[in-house]
Amino acid sequence: MSIITLTTDFGLKDHFVGALKGKIISQYPEAGIIDISHHVDLFNISEASYIISAAYSSFPKGTVHVIGVDCEQNAETRHIAMQWNDHYFVCADNGILSILTQKIVPQKIVEINIHDRLPGGATDMDVFVTVATHIARGGLLNVIGKEITEIKNVSELQPIVASDKASIKGNVIYIDHFGNCVTNITEKLVKDTARGRDFDITFSTKTIKSVKAQYSEWNLSGNYTLKDYEGEKLAIFNEAGFLEIAIYRSNPSTVGTAKTLLGLKFRDVVNVVFR
């Protein structure tokens, strides 16, 4: 069974997600359809880029990932299909694949050119469905598009290493269900830049002196228990390999979250400063 994943900003109130799945099944009944998320903030390509980069590796090679966020084809934005790390991604060329392509060079990218082959009134997602089902059946990328070598990158998804390697400047690119704030700074980038040096994590007027291996890594000496640390700020490299600012056992209605207690917002600056 071929797998097609869906990541959109459609939400679940309306008919859009159900209709999208119906179109996929109509074209390829054998497809296995998996929802990654339909609650991406509207038109937020940074958030979508992080979500897909964090999720894709959980799926088998050959999976087709459809990304329906800010996907309208216009004078500035084309539709593309990319083969990358033996996975396939179908989306708009709006920078949404920036996090992936800074890690590994794509195997092949095509600009989709089948629009004139579809019925009049076909939507952007109709194009994506046709391309995704074609790929899922084993179809070649060259059949549905013209090969290209470059795609758009979004600068806010790229952390900046200082010229003297004394610091890394990043930004909050995603705030999760727990209110934890994920940055665009990866563990690999920190280790490669640190070369054995210790570092502080700074944002606003606050500093975190170390990165924990897991959320519950606290000193339990004396009479302290894990519950005593509820509400404490911490930094961790999350399971996707990105630096995350969090509150231990965060809860918006009780102890608060990194977003509410630390004042962090989408796009806020977070620095790694080497000692």
What are the language-model segments listed below?
Residues T8-F10, I36, G68-C71, N85, ...:
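Fold-independent oxyanion-binding glycine-rich loops
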